[in-house]
Structures are given as structure tokens and as C-alpha cells.
């Protein structure tokens, strides 16, 4: 199944954040899932991992590039995101990227941030029950 993974899920996995890492691992390591991220998430992950260290930053980028299909963050996606009515433009870009990639779901811990999304958002727990 094609799913776009929100950055919070990737960080749960990479940082082994309890109690969320277990569900993240089940989703990210399931070969039945085709994983997508928006291109801007790669640089954001690098930035956020600075608190852990330089090696972790590189490992995060390598993990994403190896395990995910990157949805280009082009003018079409950025323009589409502006029309979605999201309070947070970055979340709108994620939703527009999921739509462009024809993903079935966005997997996130912040489901309410995607209330206006053209692609349904599920929490990891919800996704694991389908």
C-alpha cells in the first residue's frame, strides 16, 4: 500500500522514542508498504537531528533516501498546498505531496493537523488495524 509517512513517525523510529517507536517500526519495516515522504522532510529531518549529533543527521538522511520514495516539492505541490485551507502550510505541503503520489493514507501522530487533507490521515495505531 502506498502511504506517506509524516516526519514525526520517522523521528519516532530513528530516535527510538517511547512509546511510539514500536508502531513506527511495524509500519516502516513492513515490506507490503510503499513509503513516501515529501522532499522537504529530508532537510527538516537533518535539521532536527542536530540535537543528537552530526552522525545521526547523516544517518537520518541515508535512512530516508534508502527506504522512501521522495515526492518532489515542486511548484505544482506548493501551489496546491495553498488551496487546501490548512492552518500550517508545511502540513498542507505534506497533504499535497500525498495526493500527487496517489497515496492511500498519510500516517501521522498529529491527525487533526490533516483534517482538510485530500488524503485521509491515520495514526499509526489506526493504520495497523486495517
List the model feature ranges, each with a label.
Residues 69-111:
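Active-site neighborhoods of divalent-metal-dependent phosphate/nucleic-acid chemistry enzymes
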Residues 1-36, 51-59, 130:
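Short, well-structured N-terminal submotif of metal-dependent ribonuclease cores
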Residues 5, 36-37, 72, 108:
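Short beta-strand scaffold positions
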Residues 50-55, 64, 68-71:
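Helix-adjacent hinge/juxtasegments
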Residues 14, 85, 118:
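Short, flexible helix/strand-to-coil boundary loops that buttress conserved ligand/catalytic motifs
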Residues 2, 67, 100-130:
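Acidic, PIN/NYN-like endoribonuclease modules and their adjacent C-terminal/linker elements
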Residues 10, 42, 78, 114, ...:
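A generic structural signal for short hydrophobic patches within well-formed alpha-helices
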Amino acid at each position: 500500500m502506498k502511504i506517506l509517512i509524516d516526519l514525526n513517525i520517522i523521528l519516532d523510529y530513528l530516535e527510538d522514542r517511547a512509546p511510539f517507536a514500536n508502531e513506527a517500526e511495524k509500519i516502516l519495516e513492513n515490506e507490503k508498504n510503499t513509503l513516501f515522504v515529501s522532499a522537504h522532510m529530508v532537510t527538516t529531518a537533518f535539521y532536527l537531528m542536530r540535537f543528537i549529533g552530526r552522525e545521526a543527521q547523516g544517518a537520518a538522511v541515508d535512512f530516508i533516501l534508502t527506504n522512501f520514495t521522495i515526492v518532489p516539492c515542486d511548484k505544482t505541490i506548493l501551489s496546491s498546498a495553498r488551496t487546501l485551507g490548512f492552518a500550517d502550510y508545511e502540513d498542507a505541503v505534506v497533504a499535497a505531496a500525498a495526493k500527487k503520489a496517489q497515496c492511500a493514507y498519510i500516517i501521522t501522530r498529529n491527525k487533526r493537523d490533516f483534517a482538510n487533507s485530500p488524503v485521509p490521515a491515520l495514526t499509526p495505531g489506526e493504520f495497523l488495524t486495517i
